[in-house]
Amino acid sequence: AWMHPLDANLVRTGRAERPHQVVPGLLNRMLFWVFVYGNPDTVPPAEIEYEIIDDQEIPVAGGLRAIHMPGHCAGQVAFLWSRHGGVVFAADAAANAMGLRLSITYEDVDTGKKSLRKLFNQNFEVAVFGHGTPIKHAAAQQFRDTFT
């Protein structure tokens, strides 16, 4: 497993998450109650073989560049794959459910918003998410338009 050091110890010790807050809005509160509330606070502990840091290249699929995106969680990482016009694997840094938007919860919403700006200077045509559908065209511009 590959993970940022700030979250690796959570997994090693069996903690599922740190305290987080729901992003404002009725829809986010409803989605939180349906999908997040009551989830276990613990997970089976696991070994993390590799700790990754910002701007590190991961030797997978011809090279993925890690982009540290704290906010959703302290160790949130997105990956940029330079092939096919650029593909961002945004994970939970943002969501694309009913449009490109913030995820439902963040450990620190303001930090999460600042982290999304890290993608403004990246070149990528496609973005995929932990939640929601992919953006298949002009994804970088959609990030700029949404999170400016």
Model-found features: residue ranges?
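Short, charged low-complexity intrinsically disordered segments located at boundaries
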Residues: 23-24, 146-148
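Active-site HxH/HxHxD metal-binding segment of metal-dependent hydrolases
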Residues: 1-50
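Metallo-beta-lactamase
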Residues: 39-47, 57, 63-147
